[in-house]
Amino acid sequence: MATARRVARVAELIKREVSQILLSEIKDDRVGAGMVSIVDVEVSNDLQNARIFVSIYGDETAQHQAMEGLAAATPFVRREIGQRLSLRRVPTVVFLQDRSLERGSRVLALLNQLRPTFEAKAQTGVEEPLENTAEGEENPSGGE
Protein backbone atom coordinates (compact mmCIF):
# COMPACT_ATOMS: atom_id res chain seq x y z
CA MET A 1 0.00 0.00 0.00
CA ALA A 2 1.42 3.36 -1.03
CA THR A 3 1.59 6.40 1.19
CA ALA A 4 -0.88 9.22 0.70
CA ARG A 5 1.94 11.38 -0.60
CA ARG A 6 2.90 8.82 -3.25
CA VAL A 7 -0.74 8.32 -4.27
CA ALA A 8 -1.11 12.09 -4.77
CA ARG A 9 2.14 12.26 -6.74
CA VAL A 10 1.14 9.36 -9.01
CA ALA A 11 -2.30 10.93 -9.55
CA GLU A 12 -0.66 14.20 -10.58
CA LEU A 13 1.73 12.41 -12.95
CA ILE A 14 -1.14 10.50 -14.54
CA LYS A 15 -3.11 13.73 -14.91
CA ARG A 16 -0.20 15.42 -16.67
CA GLU A 17 0.53 12.49 -18.97
CA VAL A 18 -3.10 11.82 -19.90
CA SER A 19 -3.59 15.52 -20.66
CA GLN A 20 -0.62 15.36 -22.99
CA ILE A 21 -1.89 12.14 -24.58
CA LEU A 22 -5.33 13.66 -25.20
CA LEU A 23 -3.78 16.79 -26.64
CA SER A 24 -1.34 15.26 -29.08
CA GLU A 25 -1.62 11.48 -29.41
CA ILE A 26 -5.30 10.56 -29.73
CA LYS A 27 -6.48 11.00 -33.30
CA ASP A 28 -10.13 10.05 -32.67
CA ASP A 29 -12.38 12.89 -33.89
CA ARG A 30 -14.97 12.05 -31.25
CA VAL A 31 -12.58 13.07 -28.49
CA GLY A 32 -11.57 16.31 -30.21
CA ALA A 33 -15.15 17.32 -31.03
CA GLY A 34 -16.07 17.84 -27.38
CA MET A 35 -13.01 19.75 -26.16
CA VAL A 36 -12.05 17.34 -23.37
CA SER A 37 -10.07 18.52 -20.35
CA ILE A 38 -8.89 16.56 -17.34
CA VAL A 39 -10.42 17.89 -14.13
CA ASP A 40 -9.08 15.42 -11.58
CA VAL A 41 -7.48 12.01 -11.20
CA GLU A 42 -8.17 9.74 -8.23
CA VAL A 43 -5.82 6.82 -7.71
CA SER A 44 -6.60 4.00 -5.28
CA ASN A 45 -4.27 3.47 -2.32
CA ASP A 46 -2.82 0.33 -3.91
CA LEU A 47 -2.17 2.24 -7.17
CA GLN A 48 -4.19 -0.35 -9.11
CA ASN A 49 -7.09 1.87 -10.26
CA ALA A 50 -7.17 5.37 -11.68
CA ARG A 51 -10.41 7.26 -12.11
CA ILE A 52 -9.93 10.14 -14.53
CA PHE A 53 -12.58 12.85 -14.31
CA VAL A 54 -13.06 14.80 -17.52
CA SER A 55 -15.00 17.91 -18.39
CA ILE A 56 -16.39 18.05 -21.91
CA TYR A 57 -17.46 21.30 -23.49
CA GLY A 58 -20.27 20.98 -26.01
CA ASP A 59 -23.84 19.87 -26.36
CA GLU A 60 -25.15 16.56 -25.07
CA THR A 61 -24.42 14.76 -28.35
CA ALA A 62 -20.79 15.94 -28.43
CA GLN A 63 -20.35 14.94 -24.78
CA HIS A 64 -21.75 11.47 -25.44
CA GLN A 65 -19.53 11.01 -28.50
CA ALA A 66 -16.46 12.21 -26.60
CA MET A 67 -17.14 9.71 -23.80
CA GLU A 68 -17.47 6.93 -26.40
CA GLY A 69 -14.16 8.02 -27.93
CA LEU A 70 -12.48 8.03 -24.52
CA ALA A 71 -13.84 4.55 -23.79
CA ALA A 72 -12.41 3.33 -27.10
CA ALA A 73 -9.05 4.99 -26.35
CA THR A 74 -8.76 3.62 -22.80
CA PRO A 75 -6.44 0.68 -23.68
CA PHE A 76 -4.18 3.02 -25.65
CA VAL A 77 -4.09 5.54 -22.77
CA ARG A 78 -3.26 2.80 -20.27
CA ARG A 79 -0.47 1.47 -22.49
CA GLU A 80 0.97 4.99 -22.89
CA ILE A 81 0.86 5.56 -19.12
CA GLY A 82 2.78 2.31 -18.68
CA GLN A 83 5.46 3.39 -21.14
CA ARG A 84 5.82 6.93 -19.78
CA LEU A 85 5.74 6.26 -16.03
CA SER A 86 7.92 3.81 -14.19
CA LEU A 87 5.32 1.98 -12.13
CA ARG A 88 5.45 -1.64 -11.06
CA ARG A 89 1.88 -2.15 -12.26
CA VAL A 90 -0.02 0.15 -14.56
CA PRO A 91 -3.35 1.15 -13.01
CA THR A 92 -6.64 0.28 -14.64
CA VAL A 93 -7.98 3.48 -16.20
CA VAL A 94 -11.61 4.58 -16.14
CA PHE A 95 -12.84 7.85 -17.65
CA LEU A 96 -15.75 9.51 -15.83
CA GLN A 97 -17.53 12.67 -16.85
CA ASP A 98 -17.38 15.43 -14.25
CA ARG A 99 -20.56 17.49 -14.33
CA SER A 100 -19.67 19.81 -11.44
CA LEU A 101 -18.97 22.70 -13.83
CA GLU A 102 -22.43 22.28 -15.37
CA ARG A 103 -24.05 22.21 -11.93
CA GLY A 104 -22.07 25.28 -10.88
CA SER A 105 -23.12 27.25 -13.94
CA ARG A 106 -26.74 26.21 -13.40
CA VAL A 107 -26.59 27.47 -9.79
CA LEU A 108 -25.07 30.75 -10.98
CA ALA A 109 -27.83 31.14 -13.56
CA LEU A 110 -30.47 30.60 -10.86
CA LEU A 111 -28.79 33.16 -8.61
CA ASN A 112 -28.69 35.65 -11.47
CA GLN A 113 -32.42 35.12 -12.00
CA LEU A 114 -33.06 35.88 -8.32
CA ARG A 115 -30.83 38.98 -8.24
CA PRO A 116 -33.54 41.45 -9.44
CA THR A 117 -35.87 40.22 -6.70
CA PHE A 118 -33.25 40.77 -4.00
CA GLU A 119 -32.29 44.18 -5.39
CA ALA A 120 -35.95 45.26 -5.48
CA LYS A 121 -36.43 44.20 -1.87
CA ALA A 122 -33.27 46.03 -0.85
CA GLN A 123 -34.41 49.25 -2.56
CA THR A 124 -37.93 49.21 -1.13
CA GLY A 125 -36.79 48.21 2.32
CA VAL A 126 -39.29 45.37 2.59
CA GLU A 127 -36.99 43.29 4.72
CA GLU A 128 -35.41 44.83 7.78
CA PRO A 129 -31.64 44.60 7.94
CA LEU A 130 -30.07 42.88 10.92
CA GLU A 131 -29.02 45.30 13.61
CA ASN A 132 -25.83 45.03 15.58
CA THR A 133 -26.67 44.40 19.17
CA ALA A 134 -24.17 43.85 21.90
CA GLU A 135 -24.40 40.61 23.83
CA GLY A 136 -27.01 40.81 26.52
CA GLU A 137 -28.87 43.77 24.98
CA GLU A 138 -32.45 43.38 23.93
CA ASN A 139 -33.19 43.49 20.20
CA PRO A 140 -35.39 46.55 19.49
CA SER A 141 -37.42 44.67 16.88
CA GLY A 142 -38.70 42.29 19.52
CA GLY A 143 -36.84 39.20 18.27
CA GLU A 144 -34.23 37.32 20.20
Curated annotation (Swiss-Prot):
InterPro entries, alphabetized? KH_dom-like_a/b, RbfA, RbfA_dom_sf, Ribosome-bd_factorA_CS
Q: Name one Pfam family in it.
A: RBFA
Could you say which protein family the record assigns here? Answer: Belongs to the RbfA family.
Q: How does it assemble?
A: Monomer. Binds 30S ribosomal subunits, but not 50S ribosomal subunits or 70S ribosomes.
Tell me a Gene Ontology molecular-function term this record carries: ribosomal small subunit binding
Q: Which GO terms describe its cellular component?
A: cytosol
Tell me, in a sentence or two, what this protein's role is.
One of several proteins that assist in the late maturation steps of the functional core of the 30S ribosomal subunit. Associates with free 30S ribosomal subunits (but not with 30S subunits that are part of 70S ribosomes or polysomes). Required for efficient processing of 16S rRNA. May interact with the 5'-terminal helix region of 16S rRNA.
* Any GO BP annotation: maturation of SSU-rRNA
Q: Which PROSITE patterns match?
A: RBFA
Q: Sorted alphabetically, which keywords does the UniProt record give?
A: Cytoplasm, Ribosome biogenesis
Q: Where is this region: Disordered?
A: 121-144
List the Gene3D superfamilies hit by this protein, alphabetically. 3.30.300.20
Which regions are flagged for Acidic residues bias? Answer: 128-138
UniProt subcellular location: Cytoplasm
Q: Does the keyword Kinase apply?
A: no
- PANTHER family in the cross-refs: RIBOSOME-BINDING FACTOR A, CHLOROPLASTIC-RELATED
Write the protein's name.
Ribosome-binding factor A
